[in-house]
Amino acid sequence: MNISMRYFSILVVVSFSIFSFKYGFWSEASEASDSKIDTRAVSVLKGTITHVRDGDTFEINGIPVRISALDCAENSTPEGKKITRFTKKFQGKQAVCELTGAKTYDRVVGYCSIAGKDFAQTMMNETSCKLWAKYDVWDRY
C-alpha cells in the first residue's frame, strides 16, 4: 500500500468516527425504553392504578412507580403480604404522581396522592411501612 492510499484510509476512518459520534450512532439515548412512554419528559403522571406490586410500588396505566421515601416489607415476608393486600384496595383508583426524575430498576420514582391524600403518609399511618429518609429527596416528611 503506498503512502497516499494509507493516508486516504486513515482519513476515511477518522471522518466516519467523527460523523458517527456527532449524529449519535453510538449514543445510549437512542436505546428503546422499557416503558410505553418516555417518562423522563413527564413531571406529573396521572392515571388509574392498574396493578399493585407491593406496598411501595404500583403501576399507573401500566407504568411502574416506586413511591419515594417509603420503605415497606417485601412480599416474601408475612408482613409484606399483609401490606400488599392493604395496598390492593387502591387498585382501580385515580392517582397523581409528581415524579422526582429518578429511576430504579424499571420504575420511575415519585410522590403520589390518591383522592387528594398523600399515599406514602397513608401507608405510614395505616401499615407498618416506614419513612426512608434517605430517599425523601424533596423533604416532604
What are the residue ranges of the model-derived segments?
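Small beta-barrel nucleic-acid-binding modules, primarily SNase/OB-fold domains
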Residues: 2-141
